[in-house]
């Protein structure tokens, strides 16, 4: 059986989708799984053994372009027995429909009654995103209840030779860290500061960790480079050599190798949080307005710190200076350090 997955467009969602691919291999041991996703996803999909190949989705997030979707679908005809559509959007279901794939499975989403012929309508019965993904591995009449959904934790393979090449490439940037064990920080998050632990808290935590004998490496995209530099500059000058800002200096593949080399990771609710979980790093996940009930790090080595209760608070702008959210400001560096030390002592 050949299965086409229409994959998600965000790092965290892509990582959680790996639980689905693992379950599909259990349900259909001889199946081939191809994933259509943005080009940047390819390094992640290449590290998932269950995926045969990644197919580039050339359209950006939000682009409709029905003609392009028709041509893509037509090019995939007579290649697949089943399609599973993970995004909820109407447009994401067009390609399998145009490909004339017989079985087209997904959640109802934006009223996709014609485009999907194996439609699941009870999404609210599955409170976690990963449960919703894995549920699509099952036939409609045997789908387990949420509490019985088997969630196989996402993982990314890390090849020692490739990782060694990556570490060598960044030798110059990390030389001053010496032999100190490295704690990775992932201080960025989509949609701005409202989901971020304040940079001054990260700086204070870095100062305490460096004083304890650790080094700190900052990870993120080019958009996160400024906040990484804010963290470094907030450190006492004599400690800055033990903190390296790699945000914007790595591609995603290199970030995976470097994060896998860290002793532990401290992170906001972000895509890199899910990557740190997938390479089995002990991690402290800092949550504020977003809810770990929906998209937690899927790892036995994760400790979540969240001081407020309830589900997702839809906020794109923080309520305090710098755009930070009060619920994240209230998480002190001392709290994070205490939980991190407990985690490392296990």
UniProtKB/Swiss-Prot annotation:
Entry keyword Transferase: yes
Broad enzyme group: transferase
One Pfam family matching this protein: Glyco_transf_9
Pathway per the UniProt entry: Bacterial outer membrane biogenesis; LOS core biosynthesis
Record-level Gene Ontology MF annotations: ADP-heptose-lipopolysaccharide heptosyltransferase activity
GO biological process: lipopolysaccharide core region biosynthetic process
Catalysis: reaction(s): an L-alpha-D-Hep-(1->5)-[alpha-Kdo-(2->4)]-alpha-Kdo-(2->6)-lipid A + ADP-L-glycero-beta-D-manno-heptose = an L-alpha-D-Hep-(1->3)-L-alpha-D-Hep-(1->5)-[alpha-Kdo-(2->4)]-alpha-Kdo-(2->6)-lipid A + ADP + H(+)
EC id: 2.4.99.24
GO cellular component: cytosol
Zinc listed as a keyword: no
Keywords from the UniProt entry: Glycosyltransferase, Transferase
Job description of the protein: Glycosyltransferase involved in the biosynthesis of the core oligosaccharide region of lipooligosaccharide (LOS). Catalyzes the addition of a heptose unit to the heptosyl-Kdo2-lipid A module.
PANTHER family: ADP-HEPTOSE--LPS HEPTOSYLTRANSFERASE 2, TETRAACYLDISACCHARIDE 4'-KINASE-RELATED
Protein family: Belongs to the glycosyltransferase 9 family.
NCBIfam families linked: heptsyl_trn_II
Protein name per its UniProtKB record: Lipooligosaccharide heptosyltransferase 2
Organism: Haemophilus influenzae (strain ATCC 51907 / DSM 11121 / KW20 / Rd)
């Amino acid at each position: 059986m050949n299965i086409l997955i229409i994959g998600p467009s965000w790092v965290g969602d892509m990582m959680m989708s790996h639980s689905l691919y693992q379950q599909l291999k259990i349900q259909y041991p001889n199946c081939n799984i191809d994933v259509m996703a943005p080009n940047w996803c390819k390094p992640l999909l290449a590290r998932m053994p269950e995926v045969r190949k990644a197919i580039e989705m050339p359209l950006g997030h939000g682009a409709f372009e029905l003609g392009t979707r028709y041509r893509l679908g037509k090019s995939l005809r007579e290649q697949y027995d089943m399609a599973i559509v993970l995004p909820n959007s109407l447009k994401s279901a067009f390609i399998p429909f145009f490909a004339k794939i017989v079985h087209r499975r997904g959640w109802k989403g934006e009223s996709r009654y014609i485009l999907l012929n194996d439609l699941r309508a009870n999404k609210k019965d599955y409170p976690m995103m990963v449960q919703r993904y894995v549920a699509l591995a099952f036939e409609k009449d045997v789908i387990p209840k949420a509490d019985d959904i088997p969630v196989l934790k996402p993982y990314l393979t890390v090849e020692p030779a490739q990782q060694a090449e990556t570490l060598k490439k960044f030798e110059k940037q990390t030389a001053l860290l010496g032999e100190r064990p490295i704690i990775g920080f992932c201080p960025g998050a989509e949609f701005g500061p409202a989901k971020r632990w304040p940079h001054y808290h990260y700086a204070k935590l870095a100062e305490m960790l460096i004083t304890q004998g650790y080094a700190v490496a900052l990870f993120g995209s080019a958009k996160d480079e400024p906040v990484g530099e804010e963290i470094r500059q907030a450190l006492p000058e004599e400690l800055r050599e033990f903190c390296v800002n790699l945000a914007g200096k790595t591609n995603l593949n290199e970030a995976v190798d470097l994060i896998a080399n860290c002793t532990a990771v401290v992170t906001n609710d972000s895509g890199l949080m899910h990557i740190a979980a997938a390479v089995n790093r002990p991690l402290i996940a800092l949550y504020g307005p977003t809810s770990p009930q929906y998209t937690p790090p899927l790892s036995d080595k994760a400790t979540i710190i969240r001081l407020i209760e309830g589900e997702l608070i839809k906020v794109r702008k923080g309520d305090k200076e710098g755009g930070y959210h009060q619920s994240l400001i209230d998480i002190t560096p001392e709290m994070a350090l205490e939980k991190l030390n407990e985690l490392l002592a296990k």
